[in-house]
């Protein structure tokens, strides 16, 4: 079961985290001799030391400064998962709104992010999804083709194929995902050195998660039914396995709002919305 409060407090008292053994200059490549373990009085989440060797230091650092994810270079990607086999709204990724496929509108928004190094469209090997690959090529982004049912595996393989350390989990129906909140969440995610970061105070369909590669690997290795990982959020919220970080939008949205493309009436709603704001 979960650790009780006493055990958590006890572990925090004696927790050690990796730190820089001496002053280091920006762009220094870390070796094992650059790292020391010291007591973490901040009680923060330590970076896994196994992931530090060979990494470049982002900025000049001081002796015994604790190492956080934002202390070293990280490759951050946005992985958009989509396929054409939707049952509720068939081919919804290809349905057009104001002359653009809905999946292209998602790509447009992610391209506005400043903290993302790479955008990847992760789809399946099914012939029907050839059209999605064509759109990815047209829009100048990368693509990966993987498992149809095991969505967690598709994320993991896509991230690994492009050497990502962390990725933003994007679903193809998230037409109004917020690029400013994504950037804000990435900064918080790296600063906290956590496993997964959730956005809060956001309408349904606009909040996304930032996930480390090791986190998605753990889900693949422990999920009792790998083909039931489409709703990945339920696995990511397991605080028994993962250190979880939350980032609020700072706004008071109506939590009953649903901004996602699932049904025919959603398509009509977004068409009206885009027509209004594109006048």
Residue ranges, per PLM feature:
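Conserved N-terminal catalytic core of the sugar/cofactor nucleotidyltransferase
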Residues: 104-163
């Amino acid at each position: 079961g979960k650790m009780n409060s006493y055990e958590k407090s006890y572990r925090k008292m004696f927790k050690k985290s990796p730190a820089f053994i001496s002053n280091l200059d920006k762009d220094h490549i870390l070796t094992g001799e650059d790292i020391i373990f010291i007591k973490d009085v901040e009680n923060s989440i330590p970076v896994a030391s196994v992931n530090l060797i060979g990494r470049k230091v982002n900025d000049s650092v001081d002796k015994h400064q604790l190492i956080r994810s934002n202390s070293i270079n990280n490759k951050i990607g946005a992985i958009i998962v989509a396929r054409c086999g939707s049952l509720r709204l068939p081919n919804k990724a290809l349905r057009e709104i104001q002359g653009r496929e809905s999946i292209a509108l998602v790509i447009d928004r992610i391209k506005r992010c400043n903290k993302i190094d790479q955008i990847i469209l992760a789809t399946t090997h099914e012939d029907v999804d050839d059209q999605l690959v064509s759109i990815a090529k047209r829009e100048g982004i990368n693509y990966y083709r993987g498992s149809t049912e095991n969505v967690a595996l598709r994320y993991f393989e896509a991230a690994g194929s492009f050497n990502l350390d962390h990725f933003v989990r994007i679903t193809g129906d998230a037409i109004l995902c917020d690029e400013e909140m994504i950037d804000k969440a990435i900064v918080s995610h790296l600063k906290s050195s956590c496993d997964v970061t959730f956005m809060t105070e956001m309408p349904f369909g606009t909040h996304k998660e930032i996930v480390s590669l090791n986190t998605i690997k753990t889900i693949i290795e422990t999920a009792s039914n790998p083909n039931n990982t489409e709703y990945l959020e339920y696995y990511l919220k397991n605080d028994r396995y993962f250190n979880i970080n939350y980032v609020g939008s700072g706004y008071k949205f109506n939590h009953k709002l649903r901004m996602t493309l699932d049904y025919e009436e959603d398509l009509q709603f977004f068409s009206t919305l885009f027509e209004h704001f594109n006048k």
